Amino acid sequence: MSGDKPHGRLVILAGPSAVGKSTVVDRLRSDVPNLYFSVSMTTRDPRPGEVDGRDYFYVTAQEFQEKIDRGEMLEWADIHGGLQRSGTPAEPVRQAREEGRPVLVEVDLVGARNIARLIPEAETIFLAPPSWEVLVERLTGRGTESQDVINRRLETAREELAAQSEFKHVIINDDVDTAVSAIKAVLLGT
């Protein structure tokens, strides 16, 4: 990194499944110039419309473990009761920050805790639903998961909601425009 360019601001975004993280992130990607959005790696199957390398890097469990073993992951976790593994590749985040770009990392609760411990100057944002009932409605309305998967995601959501006080910022996603504006202000330090 050159001496006259500060590190880019690192913002960690977490929240329960179906809270609207993907919608908010899509808007931020188009609204924030020079934003580096960290693409997570996952062992889960793509949902309809998701693209490898844009939404996630989709890998097998074996490939994921090999990347961990080589030290190529900033953080990783087994999530939803062991249904899948997800994590953040380290090198692209480091490089974008050295270039002075704002960096947005979308992770689960465990990932947020791990990155915040490694990079304490990171800003942490918890994206919360307006209510538990709205979250349940959004999750079941997707129609992409079995009831067993929905139940596991709801169990995980209860744990995540209980931990929201650990985050520097809690933003309620009852209006996408308002949520995007609030996150944008944190990303840009305004």
Curated annotation (Swiss-Prot):
GO terms for molecular function: ATP binding; guanylate kinase activity. The keyword Nucleus does not apply. ATP binds at residues 15-22. Its EC number is 2.7.4.8. It is found in: Cytoplasm. Keywords: ATP-binding, Cytoplasm, Kinase, Nucleotide-binding, Transferase. GO terms for cellular component: cytosol. It comes from the Bacteria. The keyword RNA-binding does not apply. It catalyses: GMP + ATP = GDP + ADP. InterPro entries: GK/Ca_channel_bsu (IPR008145), Guanylate_kin-like_dom (IPR008144), Guanylate_kinase (IPR017665), Guanylate_kinase_CS (IPR020590), P-loop_NTPase (IPR027417). Residues 8-188 form the Guanylate kinase-like domain. Its main location: cytoplasm. SUPFAM superfamilies: P-loop containing nucleoside triphosphate hydrolases (SSF52540). Essential for recycling GMP and indirectly, cGMP. Belongs to the guanylate kinase family. PANTHER family: GUANYLATE KINASE, GUANYLATE KINASE-RELATED. This is Guanylate kinase. The gene is gmk.
